[in-house]
C-alpha cells in the first residue's frame, strides 16, 4: 500500500466521519 492510497483512505474516513457528525448534530443526537 503506497502513501497516496493511504492518504486517500484517511481523507475519505475523515470526510465520512465529519458528515456523520453533521447529521447527528442536526438530529440532536
Curated annotation (Swiss-Prot):
Main subcellular location: plastid
Transmembrane segments: 3-23
Assigned keywords, A-Z: Chloroplast, Electron transport, Membrane, Photosynthesis, Plastid, Thylakoid, Transmembrane, Transmembrane helix, Transport
SUPFAM superfamilies: PetN subunit of the cytochrome b6f complex
Molecular function via GO: electron transporter, transferring electrons within cytochrome b6/f complex of photosystem II activity
Cellular compartments per GO CC: chloroplast thylakoid membrane; cytochrome b6f complex
Superkingdom of the source species: Eukaryota
Membrane topology, record value: Single-pass membrane protein
One Gene Ontology biological process: cytochrome complex assembly
Compartments, record wording: Plastid, Chloroplast thylakoid membrane
Protein family according to the UniProt entry: Belongs to the PetN family.
Job of this protein: Component of the cytochrome b6-f complex, which mediates electron transfer between photosystem II (PSII) and photosystem I (PSI), cyclic electron flow around PSI, and state transitions.
Subunit structure comment from the entry: The 4 large subunits of the cytochrome b6-f complex are cytochrome b6, subunit IV (17 kDa polypeptide, PetD), cytochrome f and the Rieske protein, while the 4 small subunits are PetG, PetL, PetM and PetN. The complex functions as a dimer.
Name under which the protein is recorded: Cytochrome b6-f complex subunit 8
Species assigned in the record: Trieres chinensis
